[in-house]
Amino acid sequence: MAKNLVIVESPAKAATIEKYLGKNEYTVKASMGHLRDLPKSQLGIDVEARFEPKYIVVRGKNDLLKELLKQAAQADKVYLATDPDREGEAIAWHLAALLNISPQDPCRIEFNEITKTAVVEALKHARIIDDNKVNAQQARRVLDRIVGYKLSPLLWKKVRRGLSAGRVQSVAVRLICDREREIEAFEVTEYWSIHATMQKNDTSAASFEAELSTFEGKKLAISSAEMAESTIKELSQAEFLVEQVKRGDRQRKPYPPYITSTLQQDASHKLGYSAKKTMMLAQQLYEAGHITYMRTDSTRVSNEAQAQARQWVEANLGTRFLPATPPQYAKKAAQDAHEAIRPSLPEVSVNELPATLSRDQKRVYELIWKRFIASQMRPAIFDTMAVVIAAGKYGLRANGSILRFPGYLAVYSDAAEGQATAANDKLLPPLVESEPLTAEEIRPEQHFTEPPARFTEAAL
């Protein structure tokens, strides 16, 4: 019989950890989530006694509980290795109560990544269960139950049977309704812009686009077709001279590593995945040992992971892509000391993952890997050029930029993130102040103001 029992939440996580620890000294079992919860048939909260919750064993889990009790009785030591968040802490607390583990027993271990090094290190630093985390989860669970059980019947009565209300869901509905009222109240306004195709006298140079911006030094607003036509008529009779040329550079910094919300948003925008699907895939990658824990609001990264990322960049791209010191992405008020979402082994790119992973799993891993590696690299640098063109009382502007150093963009090959210039940037020909120009074409464009967009799942 194994000397130690380790309890985790899922069979996949159990299999990965048992592979690292071996079966001779450790048995790893899964609790399949919560073993104890509030009853479904009643409120389950004593509102007269400081909102004390009344827990029961989850239906269908009595046999599992008996098996865990048997294993715990035969083990020299029980370790509770549930997820490293409030929910995981609460599951560990329930397990300790059901398995008769003393509150003072240092039985709780946690790790942000399922690697052999992380698991073995966690076993060396077992601690007692954190009551503050447990109480935070219980407060949330009690509030969920009160809101759901009190509001849902009202919805049944006033709207339709079968509807439900929740602590988060109800607030989201309010946000959606408020936005819809903004949209309904929005009044569309017409406006126009004037664009000119400019050409140097040296016709071998490429033409470029400029936009009308000022009249007598003040910002110009064109509100009608008639005003646009009269403006174009005046411009067509004006002389165009380069009034000002400003050259400079612009840095485009990499984003910090993912947290839960930014991963969900990017997976929605770039992959078309729902938040639920993204978290399911991330959970699978975490349990298989490929990424760190995916429920986090921290952008902190361990020194070891940063060093591994820098080694990959140096070996594959060169030292010029590395900043002198590893970047720090500090975020105050993170719920705990979790790391950001990152690859467990930064040197493993998507092409080196096991063939057993699905296409969807690999796509999410690639998002996480690229974002993390890029976050440890130097910014991209663009040479910029801003030109002011005088045309009588009018002023036009043109902006251009060209990529001088790709920096973190070297990691990306997709157009969504790795494109060299922004969509509104243009390459301008060499220009000097007082240089005359010719307007090959002057054209108006009609626009209408748009109401606020409806929320997408990612935006919410």
Residue ranges and their predicted role:
Residues L99-P103, K150, L154, E239, ...:
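A generic secondary-structure signal for well-formed alpha-helical elements
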Residues M1-Q138, K150:
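Intrinsically disordered, low-complexity regulatory segments
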Residues Q74, I114-M198, Q244-Q251:
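C-terminal or mid-to-C-terminal helical accessory/interaction module adjacent to the motor/catalytic core
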Residues K13, G88-I91, N135, A139, ...:
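Hydrophobic (often cysteine-bearing) scaffold residues that line and stabilize catalytic clefts
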Residues Y273-D336, I341:
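Extended, well-ordered alpha-helical scaffold/bundle regions in very large, multi-domain proteins
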Residues K19, T27, R36-V57, A165-Q283, ...:
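Long, highly charged, low-complexity internal segments
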Residues P11, S31-G33, D83-E89, F111-I114, ...:
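An acidic- and aromatic-residue-enriched active-site/binding cleft used to recognize and process polar
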Residues A2, D83-P84, R160-S164, R247-P256, ...:
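Conserved short loop/turn motifs at secondary-structure junctions
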